[in-house]
Amino acid sequence: DAFNAAGWTYCIDFDYMGGLSKKLNVSCIGATNYSRKTIYISEASATLHEFGHFLDWMLGFPAEHEQLFRAEAAAAPLRDYAKTNAREYFADCFAYCIIHGNDSEMMESLRKNAPQTCTYFEELEKTVGAEAFVPNDIANIF
């Protein structure tokens, strides 16, 4: 599994998230620390989004992610936070595709509003599969 092989860890750490929330003056429920290769969460709902950041890192932060963000983020059926920058857009799209992958109505909404992004993630799944980036014990929760 790519996550463990790359030396990453996943941890539920209320103190870390509380400190980060105070430091940034926002309420944080998940964070990815690339230099420490660690995903921190304080709520399960942040898990897939943070694994999206890991996947973005594994792929080397390709320029294509920035292009997709600029072209389609404004119309994508995602929360406002996902529209702040390419990193957040990619992570939220990843989570959206995992959560709604079997919901034809939700996926059609993504396809209609962000067609290039939808195609990108469909091709990515065919090429590598999401299970390569999310440990099985985490993926099985969703």
Predicted regions: what they are:
Residues 1-142:
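Active-site-flanking segments in enzyme catalytic domains
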